[in-house]
Amino acid sequence: MAARCSIAFMIMASCLSVVVSGGLPGDLFALSVASKLRVDRNSTARASSDFGRIVAAAPEAVLHPATPAEIAELVRFSASSPSPFPVAPRGQGHSARGQSLAPGGVVVDMRALASRRGRVNVSAGAAPYVDAGGEQLWADVLRATLEHGLAPRVWTDYLRITVAGTLSNAGIGGQAFRHGPQIANVLELDVITGTGDMVTCSRDKDSDLFFAVLGGLGQFGIITRARIGLMPAPKRVRWVRLAYSDVATFTKDQELLISKRASEAGFDYVEGQVQLNRTLTEGPKSTPFFSSSDIGRLAGLASKSVSGVIYVIEGTMYYNESTSTTMDQKLESILGQLSFEEGFVFTKDVRYVQFLDRVREEERVLRSIGMWDVPHPWLNLFVPRSRILDFDAGVFKGVFAGANPVGVILMYPMNTNMWDDCMMAVASDDDVFYAVGLLRSAAVIGDVERLEKENEAVLAFCHNEDIGCKQYLPYYTSQDGWQRHFGAKWSRVADLKAKYDPHRILSPGQRIFSSPASMVVVSM
């Protein structure tokens, strides 16, 4: 274990960049929230990096608020100061490129709010909903809603991340083809703007702020509460994985499963994975779904393919005791419409909670072998359906030809009409688009540089071939890049930034607008 820790530290030290910045205004420490500010090295160090472990940026202080009002006081002070400083809310720090960091400013430890009781409240009426603090983990929201036999409709694959964190991006998962992203299921928000105002907003009240904050990358306000619609929670899940050796057949079947015709009585969740080379033998070991013999069979299927690439559809059907007798019949009806490789059907029957929290077990496995706290140079893209086969040929069978990635590659479709274009999240012009997640980890020294070069090659391919990709959990180093990303929404982004965060205080780690803090970047 000591050796693994040493290796992890060397990897991190070899790839991080550090931001050195000036101090905070002295009268900040005369505020009533001063007792909640920590400036010691241990506190600032913990808030200096994120899950990606690619970037490090030291804040001057960390705020551990007891109430949202204390966050608002901090933001108001910065906004009214002759020397405004950056403020960044941080939940679990699950960003990959320093988006949750505040170089030269103050990081707000949102999880500190979770120590107060009553931050998750369920209303189980005719139109049920949950009021959840922005700092709450989705796992905690699930636990609270299940006590009432209810649950949110859409889930990210990993539940140990915060409500505000996912809603600031979009929040996608295998249920999004039916219900849209998580932001499409929000009814109301409490937001602290960049001027320190505390605003309750919805589609009908202060709607410009409501739509700006959902998918707004933290640029317009800090979400402290979200009201999220609920549905009756099922008890059990029939969990299915189907293997393919042909990408055209794989995508055709995925698109059938998310179509209106199939989805009315079909899968409740649809995702997919691309397995190539090392991911066939290493990736499945971190999940309890496949047995050793299953993995061997999948590797054998890949060996028969010229490219060495295979594809896996992952789907689920929810059910309760009252519908269990018809489950097998419904599943057989769906499978009869699909063209997966004969004999490559893998099924499990699990509790609803066990399925939703499935990545938790994978996390435990990866932590046990020292592969969780390593750099994650992830790249997530939305690829138009019209170009997904070109993307497959150019990336999986081009850029990644001969590669041996450690991690997971996701690829699954969503329906564009389930996304609200009033919100700031950017999807696709096609009626169907694919979420492609290159969720790879740097296992040894030197991997970060290699993986980053491959990411650059992927982006270059998409640009040169005019694939029309959009980044999800985006990262750009110039405002030109951000303008291209937002496209027609850019003017609205700029106008709303000027309205709700005129001093460009909030979430500087996104690098969309210049930060009020001066920064010097040096290599470690």
Curated annotation (Swiss-Prot):
GO terms for biological process: cytokinin metabolic process. GO terms for molecular function: cytokinin dehydrogenase activity; FAD binding; oxidoreductase activity. SUPFAM superfamilies: FAD-binding/transporter-associated domain-like (SSF56176), FAD-linked oxidases, C-terminal domain (SSF55103). It comes from the Eukaryota. Residues 1-22 form the signal peptide. Keywords: FAD, Flavoprotein, Glycoprotein, Oxidoreductase, Secreted, Signal. It is an enzyme of class 1 (oxidoreductase). InterPro entries: Cytok_DH_C_sf, Cytokinin_DH_FAD/cytokin-bd, FAD-bd_PCMH, FAD-bd_PCMH-like_sf, FAD-bd_PCMH_sub1, FAD-bd_PCMH_sub2, FAD-linked_Oxase-like_C, FAD-linked_Oxidoreductases_BP. GO terms for cellular component: extracellular region. Residues 55-233 form the FAD-binding PCMH-type domain. It is found in: Secreted, Extracellular space. Its cofactor is FAD. FAD binds at residues 91, 93, 95, 99, 157, 162, 168, 172, 223, 472, 507, 510. Transmembrane segments: none annotated. Glycans are attached at residues 42, 121, 277, 320. It catalyses: N(6)-dimethylallyladenine + A + H2O = 3-methyl-2-butenal + adenine + AH2. Its EC number is 1.5.99.12. The modification Pros-8alpha-FAD histidine is found at residue 94. Catalyzes the oxidation of cytokinins, a family of N(6)-substituted adenine derivatives that are plant hormones, where the substituent is an isopentenyl group. Monomer. Belongs to the oxygen-dependent FAD-linked oxidoreductase family. This is Cytokinin dehydrogenase 7. It comes from Oryza sativa subsp. japonica (Rice). The lineage of its organism: Eukaryota, Viridiplantae, Streptophyta, Embryophyta, Tracheophyta.
